[in-house]
């Protein structure tokens, strides 16, 4: 797997560091080998702890990278030719999903390893993060979390009422079929 750095204060952001949680968990799911979890569990916990340094009071994450000397987040700092020339999802929304994902995988790893206290800690964080995501990003009027995968993130996390879930699925279908021509 090599070394997966947090890349703090560089253009890479959270998405590279989350490999510390996703790679061991997905390896375990595919091969059933607990050793990968045993070898990486401490690092998985530290990655989530690092991510929580970016939490806002409402439980969602923020993007704190900016231009040198300017505390204002620079939303286009890490984008290259692979990004569309139109709108992209809010980084805070994507980072909040990543925190949920890493917390969820770490809680699952703790369960497999019999680490009950860690399982409870990371499950509680995942649940709080999921709830904060739904509260902040769901647009009740549109029945949507937004375009470009935002609805998929919400559906993966779950934890929403059935009626809301149906509206989100409807919005996602419309986005795929109408906005992006299928």
Locate the predicted segments by residue.
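Active-site core of glycosidic bond-cleaving carbohydrate-active enzymes
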Residues: 1-182
């Amino acid at each position: 797997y090599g070394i997966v750095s947090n890349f703090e204060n560089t253009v890479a952001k959270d998405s590279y560091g989350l490999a510390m949680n996703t790679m061991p968990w997905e390896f375990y799911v595919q091969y059933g080998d607990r050793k990968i979890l045993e070898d990486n569990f401490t690092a998985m916990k530290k990655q989530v702890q690092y991510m929580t340094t970016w939490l806002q009071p409402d439980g969602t994450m923020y993007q704190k990278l900016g231009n040198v000397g300017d505390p204002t987040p620079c939303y286009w700092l890490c984008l290259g030719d692979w990004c569309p020339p139109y709108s992209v999802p809010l980084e805070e929304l994507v980072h909040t999903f990543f925190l949920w994902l890493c917390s969820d995988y770490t809680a699952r790893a703790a369960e497999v390893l019999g680490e009950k206290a860690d399982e409870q800690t990371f499950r509680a964080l995942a649940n709080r993060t999921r709830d904060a995501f739904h509260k902040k990003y769901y647009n009740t009027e549109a029945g949507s979390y937004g375009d470009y995968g935002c609805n998929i993130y919400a559906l993966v996390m779950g934890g929403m009422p059935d009626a809301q879930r149906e509206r989100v699925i409807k919005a996602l279908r419309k986005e795929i079929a109408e906005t992006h021509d299928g």
